[in-house]
Structure formats: structure tokens, C-alpha cells
């Protein structure tokens, strides 16, 4: 019997998924705590991505992907928020959304606009799954609907 546990390398797709989740958490932290982008990126890269915290191990994440999402959302927020606001139902303002949902939508819309190399279906599915990690109710459906509407608008395609 061999007790050697060989660690399988984490697939790039999994590292990107972990980077997306970490980016949403960082954007949330920035929104509620007022932390700056440089500080939050440095904190996550040094102390969270792939690290153990309070007995839980963060997944190994693609640090470049994480940085790209967080800094891109901050840089492009004035472009992202109006797109999200238009895609929301008429009586919903972006400010009424839960901070986590706002972070998920901003990150997802950023990728739809900036990462044309990533299929719409991958982006929408990943961010809906992140929403499911935080919410049981209607929020994942909202994330799906808003990202799908914006994908049709900016890429001319919906999730397939």
C-alpha cells in the first residue's frame, strides 16, 4: 500500500474559476469596506489565493486572471454599471442590489466586454455558479438573466 499522495495539477479552467470567485469576494470587500484596488489585490495574492485560512484552503487561482478582473472592474465601472442598470427590471436600481450580487454582475459584465476569447456560456455559467454559492433564492436567476441580456447586447449572442 502506498501512502504517497500525488497532487494532481489544478486545471487552468479551475484556476480561472477560483480567480473569478476570489475577484467577486475582493470586489465585495472593496464595496463594503472601502479598500483600494492595489491593497486588495496585494492582500489576496499574498494571503488568500491558494492559501489556508482558518482551516479552509482557498483554491489555487490564476493570479493574473484575478488581477485582470478586479482592476478591470474598478477601471471600467462607469461603463459597466449603466449596462447592468439597463438590463435590470424597470423598478430595480443597481444600488438596491445586494453588494455580492453587484460584485458578481460587475465581474461578469467586465468579462463579457473584455474577454472576447472566453465563450459567453462559460462566463454566464461561472458567475451563476458563484451566485449559487452565496444564494439559494432568486439571485442566481437574476445573475443569469442580466448577464444573458448583456451578452446579447454586447456580443450579439446569448448563453447556448
From Swiss-Prot:
Domain of life: Bacteria
Stretches that traverse the bilayer: none
Alphabetically ordered keywords of this record: RNA-binding, Transcription, Transcription antitermination, Transcription regulation
Swiss-Prot/TrEMBL GO biological process terms: DNA-templated transcription termination; transcription antitermination
InterPro entries referenced in this protein's UniProt entry, alphabetically: NusB-like_sf, NusB_fam, NusB_RsmB_TIM44
One cellular component (GO) term of this entry: cytosol
Gene Ontology MF term list: RNA binding
Known function: Involved in transcription antitermination. Required for transcription of ribosomal RNA (rRNA) genes. Binds specifically to the boxA antiterminator sequence of the ribosomal RNA (rrn) operons.
Record-linked NCBIfam families: nusB
Protein name: Transcription antitermination protein NusB
Lineage: Bacteria, Pseudomonadati, Pseudomonadota, Alphaproteobacteria, Hyphomicrobiales
Amino acid at each position: 500500500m502506498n501512502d504517497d499522495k500525488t497532487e494532481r495539477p489544478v486545471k487552468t479552467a479551475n484556476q480561472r474559476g477560483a480567480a473569478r470567485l476570489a475577484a467577486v469576494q475582493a470586489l465585495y470587500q472593496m464595496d463594503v469596506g472601502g479598500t483600494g484596488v492595489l491593497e486588495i489585490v496585494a492582500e489576496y495574492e499574498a494571503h488568500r489565493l491558494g492559501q489556508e485560512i482558518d482551516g479552509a484552503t482557498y483554491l489555487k487561482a490564476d493570479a493574473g486572471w484575478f488581477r485582470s478582473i478586479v482592476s478591470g472592474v474598478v477601471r471600467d465601472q462607469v461603463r459597466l454599471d449603466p449596462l447592468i442598470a439597463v438590463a435590470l427590471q424597470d423598478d430595480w436600481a443597481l444600488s438596491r442590489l445586494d453588494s455580492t450580487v453587484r460584485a458578481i454582475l460587475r465581474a461578469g459584465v467586465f468579462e463579457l466586454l473584455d474577454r472576447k476569447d472566453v465563450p459567453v456560456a462559460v462566463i454566464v455559467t461561472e458567475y451563476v455558479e458563484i451566485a449559487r454559492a452565496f444564494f439559494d433564492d432568486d439571485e442566481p436567476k437574476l445573475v443569469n438573466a442580466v448577464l444573458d441580456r448583456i451578452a446579447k447586447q454586447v456580443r450579439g449572442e446569448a448563453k447556448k
